[in-house]
Regions:
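Membrane-cytosol interface segments
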Residues: 1-133, 389-418
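Histidine- and acidic-residue-rich, metal-dependent catalytic cores
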Residues: 103-418
């Protein structure tokens, strides 16, 4: 029987069906779990959760109060039985989400990235232990990421790129989720398709939890045998998602086929061209972009613009051209965080792409003079603005100019949250 109880009544051995809290504020990945020890109760307390639903058929019931000699009997604790599902509030249509500046979104995006990392780590840990995941509870996280991307795609996508090598497996999933959402919007997909594509991005690499950690995190080149083990992750993930709750066809498809290539040289099935779905083609582009822009145990990431150049060179055999071109439009020719050289001789970092304006004319924060070879007071330039004569002449490598920590020029106050 389901029963709603107060925090003070929670005890070891109870089976919690659901905490009375939003999924984002819950300290647990799984909605339902057994209270195994005092540490579990302490986590609930620290999260500030005051009520929970328990299932007395799967765990112990509340303690009945000891009845002392008293003039009046003690009333039994009232039981509340769930008879109807809770009403779900429909999310705001993405077309109605108000777009904001990079500065306005960075703080919110940083919090979402932090929460996402914890949630994905918990979800993937459950998968590594062989437990079935409840993927439908990831949808509120997808909604948070989607809302941020709709407000300003550069903020969360840029922040997710700044993962460490140790965080890669988990933050890669968050980044691909955000990239899939931005690409879905660019392709004109419906809100529901955008959500499903985002969920697919979040779950696409769940199968890597079946790969031994020493192979997954190996700093050197993989042996042929080790690479064969890694190549099994799409199939392993597909099997995991078949057992999960709330996973639709799109997530299953992307999980299994995001390493397929349009020329048939991909894996696991060697599909080509139209044998590969739109969503799997999207997953392939987003997966590769985040992989090559991220620091890995065995290599440093490339800058965003350099990564797009490399992908363009590979695109004929690897990617669907229509999808790849839409991807470029979704993040810009010079994505946020790209170091560029201006016609004036100044170096700057791209801080924002502007909706409805030329991809060649983003906002840039100039901070270094190549003429005097010295740092200059940072100045924000809207290259699309009236009277602005400066323009981008090249993308640059920070190491060429011995520049350190250029990300601070676009992160601003959010740098402390990364």
């Amino acid at each position: 029987m389901l029963k709603k109880i107060q925090f003070e009544q929670i005890r070891q051995g109870m089976y919690v069906k659901e905490l009375c809290a939003s999924w984002m504020s819950s300290p647990f990945w799984q909605k339902s779990f057994l209270v195994e020890d005092a540490a579990t109760i302490e986590k609930i307390q620290k999260a500030g959760i005051r009520e929970a639903w328990i299932d007395t058929a799967k765990g112990v019931d509340v303690l009945e109060p000891e009845i002392q000699a008293a003039p009046e009997p003690i009333a039994p604790i009232k039981e509340v039985v769930v008879e109807t599902p809770k009403q779900v509030v429909a999310p705001v249509p993405y077309s109605q989400v108000v777009q904001v500046s990079m500065d306005a979104e960075l703080g919110r995006a940083a919090k979402i990235v932090g929460t996402s990392k914890t949630a994905v780590f918990s979800m993937f840990s459950e998968a590594r232990m062989g437990n079935a995941i409840e993927a439908e509870h990831a949808m509120p996280l997808v909604e948070e990421i989607a809302s941020s991307v709709m407000r300003n795609p550069g903020a969360l996508i840029g922040l997710a790129r700044l993962k460490t090598a140790d965080d890669y497996t988990y933050m890669h999933s968050v980044a691909v989720c955000a990239l899939m959402i931005a690409l879905s919007r660019q392709l004109g997909l419906s809100d529901e398709e955008v959500r499903e594509a985002g969920l697919a991005g979040l779950l696409h690499d769940i199968g890597k939890m079946a790969v031994p950690p020493e192979i997954l995190n190996k700093p050197g080149r993989l042996t042929e045998e080790e690479f064969t083990s890694v190549k099994e992750h799409p199939g392993a993930g597909y099997e995991m998602l078949l057992e999960a709750k709330g996973v639709g066809k799109i997530a299953l498809d992307v999980c299994l086929h995001h390493h397929e290539k349009v020329d048939g040289s991909g894996y696991p099935k060697g599909l080509n061209g139209e044998q590969i779905s739109l969503y799997a083609k999207m997953g392939a582009v987003c997966d590769v972009y985040d992989a090559i822009t991220s620091n890995r145990p065995y290599k440093a990431g490339w800058c965003p613009a350099e990564s797009l150049k490399k992908m363009a060179e590979w695109s004929k055999g690897h990617f669907d051209d229509r999808v790849f071109q839409a991807f470029i439009r979704s993040i810009g020719i010079y994505p946020v965080g790209t170091l560029v050289k201006l016609h004036s001789g100044r170096l700057g970092v791209v801080v924002e792409q502007q909706v409805g304006k030329s991809l060649l004319l983003p906002k840039v924060r100039a901070f270094f003079s190549t003429k005097s070879m010295a740092y200059i007071p940072p100045v924000l330039l809207d290259l699309s603005g009236p009277g602005i004569q400066d323009k981008i002449v090249s993308r640059e490598d920070a190491s060429t100019w011995d520049l350190k920590d250029i990300n601070r020029y676009w992160l601003g106050d959010a740098v402390d949250s990364v």
